[in-house]
Amino acid sequence: MRQIVFALSFALFSASSAHAIECLNGQSGDILSLESWELLDRENEAEKTINIALHHSGPVGIRLIDATVRFEDVLGERIGEFPLERADGIGAGQDHILNAVVAGTILERLENLHPDDVIGIACVSALVYEDGTLQDFSD
């Protein structure tokens, strides 16, 4: 299977973008950092797989999480959202890869926009740390 890779370092281009992406409704954008993303071909040409690399730099691992990765263009128009699986544990200082199938207008936008014009953020609504501490950002 041929791979189309759009691996991007979000730290490089989000600092120079015209629009700063933010989490909504009291969600936290400080728990997980969005490191890169890539589109991979699938057998069905109308779909691709998106791999999103996240990093948790906190001192305590996460055992349960309610989070979504959002993408926008640098002018602030929404491209799409990808929810994390709630039960995916993420160790302290560890990376996590979110895999999702992408199709339709989301895929078209990701393929047609220049990679420097796509920005993303991982927004956390709530989580349970490995030590049992519950943190809810909607309060």
Spans of features found by a protein language model:
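Intrinsically disordered, low-complexity Pro/Gly/Ser/Thr-rich segments with frequent PxxP/GP/PP motifs
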Residues: 77-113
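Bacterial N-terminal signal peptides
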Residues: 5-15
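Solvent-exposed strand-loop boundary residues in beta-sheet-rich modules
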Residues: 73-77, 131-133
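Short, acidic/polar linear motifs in exposed loop/turn regions
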Residues: 56-61, 75
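Terminal connector regions
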Residues: 99-139
